[in-house]
Amino acid sequence: MEEKEEGKIRINKYLSDAGVCSRREADRQIAAGNVRIGDAVARIGDLVMPDMPIYYQGRLVEAEEEPILLVVNKPKGIVCTAQKKEKDNIVDFLHYPKRIYPIGRLDKQSEGLILMTNKGDFVNKIMRSGNRHEKEYLVTVHKTASDSFLRALAEGVPILDTMTRKCRVERIGKRSFRMVLTQGMNRQIRRMCEYFDYRVVSLKRVRIMNIRLGDLPTGAYRKVTPEELKRLEQLLENSSNDTVRFDSSAIDQQLWEEEE
C-alpha cells in the first residue's frame, strides 16, 4: 500500500511519478545514499509530501508534472530517439513544449503510432514484454502473401535465437495483412517475413493496447482522451514496471527491443 499517512507517498513512487527513474532504480539510489529529503539522507520506505524538497543525485526534483501522454503518427524517416545527436530524432521533429520521451520504437522506415510521455511508469509498464500488451500493425510485402506464409507467421518464427510468440494474422489484401503482436523484438516483423523470403515494403503500427491511431494525419499528434487514459490505466494496473530505467542518458539502449 503506497499511502500510509494522508497526503504522503513512498519516496520511490514520488521519484517515479516525477519521471526521474523507475521505483526499483529509486530504491537502488536511496540505498546508495544518493537521495535526500531536505538535509537528511533518505531511507527506503520513507514517506514524503509533494511539497518537500527532494534531491536526486544532488539535483532538486521538480514538483510532479501533469501526466502527458501523446498519440503520434510517426512519418517514415523519423528516428524514435530522444538523443539530440540524431538529426531526425522524434523529439525535435515534434517540437513539443515540454520534455517527453517515446515509448518504444518504430524503425526509421516504419510509420504509424508511437506514444510519447513524461511518465516513467507508462514507459516501464508498456515496454516490459512480459506484460504481453498487444500492438497491431498493417504490413505489405513485395509479392503475393500465400495462405501458408500467413499461417506460418501466426504460429511463430525462429529469429534472433528464439521462437517468436504466436500472434494473430489476418489477410486484408493480396500482398497486405494485419498482425497483432504481444512482444517486441528488434525488427521483429521484418525478420519474420525475411525468414520466408518476403520483403516488407510498408509497415504501419495502428494500435498499442487500447490506443488507436485512427485518422490522425501523418506527422500530427494528439493527447489521449480521458476515456483512453482511464482504460489504459486499467490495463496497466497489474503490469510490472520495474525493468526499464527511465532517463535520457540510457533510454536508447533500454528501448531497442521495441523496434519492429
Predicted regions and their residues:
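Basic, flexible Lys/Arg- and Gly-enriched helix-loop patches that mediate nucleic-acid binding at interfaces
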Residues: 2-260
